[in-house]
Amino acid sequence: MASGTMRDPKNSRAENTRPRSTEIFERGKKTLVGGVNSPVRAFRAVGGTPLVIDYAKGARLFDVDGREYIDFVCSWGALILGHAHPDIVAAISDQAARGTSFGMTSPLEVELGEKITKAIPSVEMVRFVNSGTEAAMSAVRLARGFTRRDLIVKFEGCYHGHSDSFLSEAGSGLATLGISASPGVPDAFASLTLNTPYNDLNGVENIFKQYPGKIAAVIVEPVAANMGVVPPAFGFLEGLRAITKKEKSLLIFDEVITGFRLAYGGAQSVFKIDPDLTVMGKIIGGGLPVAAYGGKREIMEHIAPMGPIYQAGTLSGNPLAMRAGLATLPKLEVPGFYEDVNRKSQRLAEGLRSALKDAKLHGEVNVSGSLLTMFFTDVPVRNYAGAKKSNAARFGAFFQNMLSRGIFIAPSQYEALFISAAHTDADIDRAIAATHESLASMQEH
C-alpha cells in the first residue's frame, strides 16, 4: 500500500496480510529462532505478519510486498537523521574500500572519542564496544571493581540490555512478552541486582539503609524509554545523585536511547546532572552496531590495559561504525537541529491527545524531546506499575490500524515512537490523521 493512501479497514489484520513477508517469515522460522533475531520483531504482542523490510530511505520503510510506511521506530531510535542519509552512506562506502576491520587502533576511534568527550563533560574517557548490552554490562563490572562492592540498584521497567545483571523486572522486550525474569539466570547472581520503582526516591533510600556499604552503583535511564516513555519526576535524578554521593556509590546513566537524542550532551545536559559513568549507543554509530561507556578519568583508568578490570572485543571501535558516527555527530551540532525534531515531536503528541479526546478514549501521551508514547490507560504513567495498566489488546488493534494506513510504530505498548530529522511536517500530519481514523475505526468495531 502506498503511504499516501489512507484506508479504513473493517478488518485491519486482514488488510495487513502480506504474502511475500509471510513466506519469508515462515521460511526464516526454520533457521532463525522464532523467525527473528530480536523478539519484539515477531509481532507477538500485536499479532499479524511481521514486517520484512526490503529497503529504507529517509523516513520511509519499504517492505518486500512493495508497501511503503512512514517509520516512527527509526531502528529503535538509532537513526536520528533517518534511513540511508547520503553523507553516512558515502562515509561507510568509502571506509569499506579502505578496510572494514583492522583489529588494531585507527585514528577514527580517537576522533570519535574526542567528539564524545567534548560533547559530554562528565565523560572524560571512553571505551567503544559493539552493543548497548555490552556497554551496560561492562559499566557495571567497572563499578563493582572500582568500589569493591557487589550490589547494583536498578529500576523496574528500565532496560539495560540482556546481560544477567538486568533481566529481572526489565522493560523493552521482556515487558512486551510479559517475562518478569529470564530462566538461565542463577538466583545467586540475580540476587546481586536490587529492583525498586522508577521515580521513587524513598525506595532507593530504603535499599541503601538495608544494604549499607554494599551497593556499587545505581543504574538508571534518565528518561525511561523501555516501559514506554516515562520522564523523571521533579527532583528524582537530583536525589539519585545526592544519595550515591553520600553513600560513595557510583551513578550510572544509561543513555543508549537518550544520548545525543534529547540534546547533543544527552539527557544529563538537559537535567544538569553529572553521573559517574555513562552508557551510550544507537545514535553514536549512525545506524551501525556500536556502543560505548565512559566517565571520570579516575574510574575509567581501572579498565585494562591501564588497570585490572578486564574488557575486550574483536570488533570494538571498528572503522565502519566510527566513520558512520563521525558522519552523524557534526550534523547534530547544527543550530536548531534539536529544536526542529522536538517541535515535530510535540506536534505529534498534541495530535495524539486530540485524537484520543475526539474518540472519547482514555489515554496518556508522555513525551520527552523527540521520543514519545501513547498509553491506552486512564491513569498517569509515572513508573512501570502504571505502564502495565495499559490496555494491551487495544494497543494491538491500534497498531494494526495504523500499519494498514502506512504508519509504522513500535509493535509494543512498552516502546517509544521516535522522530527523526527526515520526518516532515506532512509526515506528522499524516500520522495524526491516521490516528484519528484508527481510533474511530476501533470505536466502530
Where are these regions (language model features)?
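Conserved N-terminal phosphate-binding loop of PLP-dependent enzymes in the Aspartate aminotransferase
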Residues: 4-445
